[in-house]
Every structure is written in structure tokens, then in C-alpha cells.
Amino acid sequence: MSVTPSPIETNAPKPLKKGSLVRVNPEAYKNSLESLASDQSSPEYIFEGPGELVAIKQDYGQVRWRRPVPDVWLRLDQLQAWTEGS
């Protein structure tokens, strides 16, 4: 009988899915096409979070902020999971 090795735990981030709470990763967003197409000074709330990931299409996610502002589409690699106090 073979023994199945236990999965190795890694610190890799969990993949984002619809309904996830997210924030924008400033390092990934800086100098991206999306940031260059926006105002020069990005609002702080996108980096503080949380925003809700309401849709995913290919490499992009639609984020809805808890503010009276329009939803935005950003690349998934520019988003990271939001945690309390992050």
C-alpha cells in the first residue's frame, strides 16, 4: 500500500474568486497601463480596500468599492486579498 504524501503548505496567495474582498497592490498597479490611463493621483481607498470582486473575465476582475463610485476593471495580478488591518 502506498502512502500519499501530505500536501506541502506554502504561503502562496489563494486565487481570487467572485465575492472575494480585495485591495489594489500599489507595486503592481504603479506604471501599469491602467494607472497611466487614470488620474495621476489614485484615490487611497483602492489601496486600503476592501472592494468586492463582482465579476471575473479572463485576466481581469471587476471591483465594486463600498463608496458611491463606478465599478472598475483591473488585472487580477494587480489585486490582492484584503485582510482586516492590511
Curated annotation (Swiss-Prot):
EC numbers on record: 7.1.1.-
Keywords: Membrane, NAD, NADP, Plastoquinone, Quinone, Thylakoid, Translocase, Transport
Predominant location: membrane
Pfam family, one: NdhO
Catalytic activity line of the entry: a plastoquinone + NADH + (n+1) H(+)(in) = a plastoquinol + NAD(+) + n H(+)(out); a plastoquinone + NADPH + (n+1) H(+)(in) = a plastoquinol + NADP(+) + n H(+)(out)
UniProt GO MF annotations: oxidoreductase activity, acting on NAD(P)H, quinone or similar compound as acceptor; quinone binding
GO cellular component terms given for this protein: plasma membrane-derived thylakoid membrane
Subcellular location as annotated: Cellular thylakoid membrane
Membrane topology (UniProt): Peripheral membrane protein
Quaternary structure, from the entry: NDH-1 can be composed of about 15 different subunits; different subcomplexes with different compositions have been identified which probably have different functions.
Function as written in the Swiss-Prot or TrEMBL entry: NDH-1 shuttles electrons from an unknown electron donor, via FMN and iron-sulfur (Fe-S) centers, to quinones in the respiratory and/or the photosynthetic chain. The immediate electron acceptor for the enzyme in this species is believed to be plastoquinone. Couples the redox reaction to proton translocation, and thus conserves the redox energy in a proton gradient. Cyanobacterial NDH-1 also plays a role in inorganic carbon-concentration.
Family: Belongs to the complex I NdhO subunit family.
Identification of the protein by name: NAD(P)H-quinone oxidoreductase subunit O
Gene name, Swiss-Prot/TrEMBL: ndhO
